[in-house]
Amino acid sequence: MLDNVLRIATRQSPLALWQAHYVKDKLMASHPGLVVELVPMVTRGDVILDTPLAKVGGKGLFVKELEVALLENRADIAVHSMKDVPVEFPQGLGLVTICEREDPRDAFVSNNYDSLDALPAGSIVGTSSLRRQCQLAERRPDLIIRSLRGNVGTRLSKLDNGEYDAIILAVAGLKRLGLESRIRAALPPEISLPAVGQGAVGIECRLDDTRTRELLAALNHHETALRVTAERAMNTRLEGGCQVPIGSYAELIDGEIWLRALVGAPDGSQIIRGERRGAPQDAEQMGISLAEELLNNGAREILAEVYNGDAPA
């Protein structure tokens, strides 16, 4: 392969392509003369649209095909939405760069109502996420929550067609696609704790590819990486994928990491919450110890049910 060419494996959804172009532009700005090519591909998660993610099962629904391209040397890096990245990587691959985080909050989107609390009883709310579902159901048990799959444009069309009274999407995705005007309210973490890594873009590559790792170093955002490290450590201990009722959000405040997390029964009947504060260098250990606390406080039983009896040890 030519020394001045770098190939990016990406999904073909508008949001995935935005992320790939974002990384491409950053790389070319940092390394004049570098030629960056996109290698678009379709993942299993893109194809299975008629089934809720939690029922499809498996981890890495949106990344596996991209990882195969890396292993077969058809691409040099894969660009992912961090909330889709599994906790484990195929041998020889790893997450080497996390870019600066966009707003990680969930967005309340509706054509008729200004806020979640303004929805009348019996309103239909669309979301594809068990994490969002359990928090919505806890706060508003009088709402009807229905599955909503597809890319951002598809989901907005279903709302506009009247299938839903409101839908919940990620603020980051809407902003990146130039659809910020559709956001009626950004939900604070106290109402909807974000997904692990939500709003951050991660870059995966072959661990022995020194040249590519050196090119990517300039794109790593230290604060975002610290925060996502704490969130992912917790998720790893919980054996969480991208379709489980787990929320985790870390902030860096006055030089200290504040990590909040939850595990919820999908129907909102029970949500186990916890938090930790500590030094940035302890980010990983904080995540693990918070996960242990959640497991001991009832999360193990909730996850066993979601995972069909296969609970974290």
From Swiss-Prot:
Gene Ontology molecular functions: hydroxymethylbilane synthase activity
Highest taxon, organism lineage: Bacteria
PROSITE patterns (alphabetical): PORPHOBILINOGEN_DEAM
Modified residues (S-(dipyrrolylmethanemethyl)cysteine): 242
Cofactor(s) this protein requires: dipyrromethane
Cofactor note: Binds 1 dipyrromethane group covalently.
GO BP annotation list: protoporphyrinogen IX biosynthetic process
Keywords for this protein: Porphyrin biosynthesis, Transferase
GO cellular component: cytoplasm
Record flagged with keyword Nucleotide-binding: no
InterPro entries per the UniProt record, alphabetical: HemC (IPR000860), Porphobilin_deaminase_cofac_BS (IPR022419), Porphobilin_deaminase_N (IPR022417), Porphobilinogen_deaminase_C (IPR022418), Porphobilinogen_deaminase_C_sf (IPR036803)
Listed Pfam families: Porphobil_deam (PF01379), Porphobil_deamC (PF03900)
Reaction catalysis annotation: 4 porphobilinogen + H2O = hydroxymethylbilane + 4 NH4(+)
Pathway: Porphyrin-containing compound metabolism; protoporphyrin-IX biosynthesis; coproporphyrinogen-III from 5-aminolevulinate: step 2/4
EC number(s) recorded for this UniProt protein: 2.5.1.61
Alphabetical list of PANTHER family matching this protein: PORPHOBILINOGEN DEAMINASE
Functional description taken from the UniProt entry: Tetrapolymerization of the monopyrrole PBG into the hydroxymethylbilane pre-uroporphyrinogen in several discrete steps.
Family under the similarity heading: Belongs to the HMBS family.
Subunit structure as annotated in this protein's UniProt entry: Monomer.
Additional remarks: The porphobilinogen subunits are added to the dipyrromethane group.
Protein name, UniProt field: Porphobilinogen deaminase
Gene: hemC
